[in-house]
Amino acid sequence: MKKYISYLASIFKPSSSVAKTDNFKDATDAYNKSNYAKAIELFSPLATEGNTAAQWYLGWMYKNGEGVMQDYKEAALWYRKAADQGDASSQFNLGLMYSAGDGVTQDHKEVVKWYQKAGDQGDLGAQFNLALMYKNGEGVTQDYEESAKWYRLAGDQGDVGAQFNLAQMYESGEGVIQDNKESAKWYHLAGDQGQAKAQYRLGMIYDRGIGVIQDFEESAKWYRKAGDQGDARAQYLLGAKYDEGIGVLQDHEESAKWYRKAGDQGDARAQYNLGLMYKNNKGSGQDLKESAKWFRLAAEQGDAGSQFNLGLMYDNGQGVVQDNKESAKWYRMAGDQGDARAQYNLGLMYKNGEGVIQDYKEAVNLYRLAAEQGHAKAQSNLGFMYAIGQGVTKDYVCAHMWCNLAASNGHRIASENLDKIAKGMTPAQIDEAQDMARDCKT
């Protein structure tokens, strides 16, 4: 999160009592022409006489090494002289020096003291930094209400960062009464000034109707504004809108464009969707190598769907050289994250000894993981292995239960096997198996 730093154009506003002297005007003219040595020569006697504007300039020039050797202690000395006379800009800059430990011993309490003095006079940077310190409990007791107060003061002056942070506080109810409408108001103020983070949040709240009337077109508008500034999250979500035709006319080429912008920045969701689009000839033309490339980028970030799809491509030799070991590796990664498709496919590989050492027990374990998530093929295969005692002790009751579940999920072979298994069971065993299946369904 940002902290303000001092900057010449907007921090210093010389008072009329000091700005009209000829020497002061000559000094500022010299400074503006980058004739720093002359400016120092002219500012110094004015500063010694107590001219706060000249004192501020000397503080600035010593701090930045303009016309003199950089000297933080000397900078702090001149800022203090002006600050003690009530100059808000110097108070703020002295607070900055205590914050960084430049020319003075670092002291957060001293920082707060000087920011408070400047903030009470309306110094925007001091107000923002005070809000940040109260929010983080830095130099003061953590106080979200006080933080919100200072953000509001800075936000009312148009500071975009304060407006965004205050919007977040209203959204979460941190330091203020939670109020989505008020949050949306502050996001609008920041977004209208071009802040990408606020524009992204506006896209989200219009998408979901949080604090505003749900409006998909308005959502897309704000995602576009943020996306045009490089916000990867907004780029992905705008791509999804074009993909589905929500708030915009469906346009797969436009969708792929925005996914690519986000994917190039490392957004795994966009990379996954690009992988699917290249695989399925959607928006960019079918290109299995390109598909595998995008799946890999997302898979390496831990995206389970991409890990499964990359495993599938190695399994089938699509866009990559067929490689069962590599396929099993990616299936395992996806399966470890709970992807039922990957668990089932890896179970098949263990059953058949493809890319791994054949292991019926491991096949059963993997089928079970997928079957418990409702994967019909895994349920059917698990039922069959119970029926023949492969990798498990033969158990017709369990076999019947799993085939029953698979059949209820529309698996034809499981339905056929169910009838065969039932022929070897007593009515009591069938009742038990059916009860177990009902329990699983509920």
PLM region descriptions:
Residues M1, L8-F12, R412-T442:
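Terminal, low-structured helical/coil segments at or just beyond the last alpha-helical repeat
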Residues N23-A30, P45-L46, Y57-N64, N93-A100, ...:
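Hydrophobic face of amphipathic alpha-helices that form TPR/SEL1-like repeat modules
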Residues N23, A30-N35, T48-N51, N64-E66, ...:
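Short helix-capping/linker turns of helical repeat alpha-solenoids
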